[in-house]
């Protein structure tokens, strides 16, 4: 892809991210689940925006999974265990400007299947 196309895609994602973040916020009881997707792996974390603290986080590199749908299911299962250990059953899903499609959608569905209410 040409550089200007990539810059445009990134700027559109940043715009979506800002629009989403203006509307949602996490607390201790209802944390914000933020997702970051790179070409190689996924990162997911639960954030309390009031105290600006990360409550739980899972790094796909440490689990040894890739940024694909199967990896998203494994990361979601690990993350759900971490949340349940901290007695968190409900959260707000922040897709971080990514389209709710593919890996991001599978990740959200897998969290729901593992008992986290989004």
Curated annotation (Swiss-Prot):
GO cellular component, one term: cytosolic large ribosomal subunit
A GO molecular-function annotation: structural constituent of ribosome
Domain of life from the UniProt record: Bacteria
Key word Plastid present: no
Example GO biological process: translation
Transmembrane intervals: none
Pfam family, one: Ribosomal_L18p
Keyword presence, Ribonucleoprotein: yes
Keywords for this protein: Ribonucleoprotein, Ribosomal protein, RNA-binding, rRNA-binding
HAMAP family from the UniProt entry: Ribosomal_uL18_B
Its biological purpose: This is one of the proteins that bind and probably mediate the attachment of the 5S RNA into the large ribosomal subunit, where it forms part of the central protuberance.
Annotated family: Belongs to the universal ribosomal protein uL18 family.
Oligomer and partners: Part of the 50S ribosomal subunit; part of the 5S rRNA/L5/L18/L25 subcomplex. Contacts the 5S and 23S rRNAs.
Name of the protein: Large ribosomal subunit protein uL18
Organism field: Campylobacter lari (strain RM2100 / D67 / ATCC BAA-1060)
Source organism phylogeny: Bacteria, Pseudomonadati, Campylobacterota, Epsilonproteobacteria, Campylobacterales
Gene name, Swiss-Prot/TrEMBL: rplR
């Amino acid at each position: 892809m040409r550089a200007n196309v990539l810059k445009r895609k990134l700027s559109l994602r940043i715009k979506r991210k800002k629009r989403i973040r203006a509307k949602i916020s996490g607390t201790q009881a209802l944390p914000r689940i933020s997702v970051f997707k790179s070409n190689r792996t996924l990162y997911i974390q639960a954030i309390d925006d009031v105290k600006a603290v990360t409550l739980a986080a899972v790094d796909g590199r440490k689990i040894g999974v890739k940024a694909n749908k199967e990896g998203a299911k494994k990361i979601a299962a690990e993350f759900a265990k971490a949340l349940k250990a901290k007695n968190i059953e409900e959260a707000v899903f922040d897709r971080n400007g990514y389209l709710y499609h593919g890996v991001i959608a599978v990740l959200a569905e897998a969290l729901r299947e593992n008992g986290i209410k989004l």
